[in-house]
Design a protein with these regions (language model features):
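Arg/Gly-rich low-complexity intrinsically disordered repeat tracts
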Residues: 7-19
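Acidic, Ala/Val/Gly-enriched low-complexity intrinsically disordered segments
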Residues: 3-7, 28-29
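Phosphate/dinucleotide-binding and metal-coordinating scaffold of catalytic cores
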Residues: 27-288
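Short, Lys/Arg-enriched N-terminal segments with co-localized hydrophobic residues
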Residues: 18-29
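Short terminal hydrophobic/aromatic SLiMs and anchors at protein ends
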Residues: 1, 11, 23-24
Length: 288
């Protein structure tokens, strides 16, 4: 799967080195555009989430992550938060926008499962620009330099992303640059919501399965570079992107209270980053 609209909306790819690398440039993207979905093109049958390729009224194609799929709103919350954190840390991530789905959208689609999904997803969903012509990253063919690999491992340990493995790398090559996609399996604490403060300090043992861990020799250096970028101000602006519509699933907490939990989770995890850094270093040592 891929994402993105016109090339002009993204940094111009310029890496010609056989090792994949790019500068740790930060991008301020704290306001998401909105558009209305107009045409369902085809389903992208990946796992249980059933995203789709669709067109919006701005004329561009998007990979749509539906709020009615699998884990419902929690998946699009994780996708939005994880993607924008990755962008802040300097990684290439397709532009994310809010996509409004109305009752008439996709009515001609004959698949009953898809019809049920669309009915459950009326309102705001999340779209990623479609990167036409992109290919999946293959660790057996494309080598990653230690700095970039270490920073990606740090990102995924920070946001507790369990889904960047050899089986499913969730990275794309597009114009000789590496792009990160699919962060919907991050923040898995919100699926149980119990003891979230304790989970914020977790070592994240799933990092042992990370596809880039063998290349990540500079995880401490990555921590020193990336941790300061996760400022309180950025985190507050980030969680404020979450629409109320996605925050109605906890009857005990209001949308603002849920936003505060996500913000506090990120702040606590940042302050205790040495815990997950050590876990990643130990896991890598066990691979050698």
């Amino acid at each position: 799967m891929g994402a993105a609209g016109p090339d002009s909306q993204h940094p111009t790819p310029n890496s010609q080195h056989p090792l994949i690398s790019h500068k740790n440039t930060t991008f301020e993207a704290m306001e998401l555009r909105s558009a209305h979905l107009t045409r369902y093109i085809l389903p992208l049958r990946e796992g249980g989430s059933l995203p789709a390729l669709a067109e919006a009224d701005d004329g561009f194609k998007y990979v749509v992550k539906f709020k009615g799929s699998g884990h419902r709103e929690k998946s699009v919350i994780a996708e939005l938060l994880g993607g924008e954190i990755a962008r802040k840390l300097g990684f290439l991530v397709p532009e994310q926008i809010f996509l409004c789905l109305d009752k008439a959208f996709g009515q001609t689609e004959g698949d009953e499962e898809i019809q049920d999904l669309l009915q459950a997803s009326q309102g705001l969903n999340l779209g990623l620009h479609f990167l036409s012509g992109s290919i999946n990253y293959d660790p057996n063919v494309m080598k990653i330099d230690a700095d970039l690999a270490s920073r990606i491992v740090w990102l995924d340990a920070y946001i507790t992303n369990v889904d960047r493995t050899f089986r499913n790398t969730n990275m794309l090559m597009w114009h000789k640059e590496l792009w990160l996609i699919d962060h919907g399996s991050s923040f898995f604490f919100h699926h149980s919501w119990d003891n979230w403060e304790k989970q914020a300090k977790s070592s994240f043992s799933f990092i042992k399965d990370h596809v880039l861990l063998p290349f990540a020799t500079d995880i401490q250096k990555a921590n020193d570079r990336l941790k300061p970028l996760m400022t309180d101000e950025f985190i507050e602006e980030l969680v404020n992107l979450l629409p109320d519509e996605w925050l109605q699933w906890n009857y005990d907490l209001s949308p603002d209270q849920l936003r505060k939990v996500y913000a506090d989770f990120l702040k606590i995890r940042r302050e205790h980053s040495e815990i997950f850094v050590k876990e990643a270093q130990d896991a890598r040592q066990n691979l050698i």
